[in-house]
């Protein structure tokens, strides 16, 4: 909320503000990274698998997409590499100063799914956490909505579901 007071001053208003949401493909994994902040994520390799709804399409108006993938989505990789750094940055004199880490490398792929994006994320840390620490930080992570006890906020923001190869076969 730090940027809002600067925005209101610039716009000459005491109420209201302009809010933007992050790129849809990064929303699935940036909260998980925030939960691991103490371990110092230093490098990410991310592959996103983005549904056709992200392009504003349906299978009815994009039938050639059925059964196909597009291995490059123009502009998405740049956004996916830069926008998390803005989210992890800080407000200095009313402007967002991007974080300098982690170094993010992305590949964004359009897949023949109507709705929903998926991300495969590989992380290298400054301080390597144990599996138990990773799960604990996810299970106990509280975002700002939880801290403010907002009525629409889920009690547990991140849920960790563990699957073994045996469970996947069932």
List the predicted regions and their residue ranges.
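Active-site-adjacent substrate-binding region
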Residues: 141-162
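N-terminal Rossmann-like NAD(P) cofactor-binding subdomain of oxidoreductases
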Residues: 1-65, 69-71, 103, 150, ...
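Short amphipathic alpha-helices in soluble, non-transmembrane regions
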Residues: 133-141
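Predominant activation on well-ordered alpha-helical scaffold segments within soluble catalytic domains
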Residues: 30-37, 81-85, 89, 135
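Helix N-cap motif at beta-to-alpha junctions
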Residues: 126-128
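Oxyanion-binding "anion nests"
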Residues: 77-120
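Conserved small/polar residues in nucleotide/adenosyl-binding loops
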Residues: 163-170
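Short hydrophobic/aromatic beta-strand micro-patches
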Residues: 122-124
């Amino acid at each position: 909320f730090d940027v809002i007071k600067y925005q209101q001053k610039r716009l000459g208003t005491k109420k209201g503000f302009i809010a933007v949401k992050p790129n849809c493909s990064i929303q699935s994994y940036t909260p998980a990274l925030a939960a691991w902040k103490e371990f110092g994520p230093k490098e990410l390799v991310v592959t996103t698998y983005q549904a056709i709804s992200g392009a504003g399409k349906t299978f009815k108006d994009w039938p050639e997409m059925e059964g196909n993938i597009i291995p490059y989505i123009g502009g998405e990789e740049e956004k996916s590499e830069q926008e998390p750094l803005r989210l992890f940055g800080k407000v200095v004199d009313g402007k967002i100063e991007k974080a300098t880490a982690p170094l993010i490398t992305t590949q964004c792929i359009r897949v023949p799914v109507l709705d929903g994006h998926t991300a495969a994320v590989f992380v290298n840390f400054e301080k390597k956490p144990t599996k138990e620490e990773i799960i604990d930080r996810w299970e106990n992570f509280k975002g700002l909505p939880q801290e403010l006890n907002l009525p629409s906020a889920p009690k547990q923001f991140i849920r960790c579901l563990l699957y073994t190869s045996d469970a996947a076969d069932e």
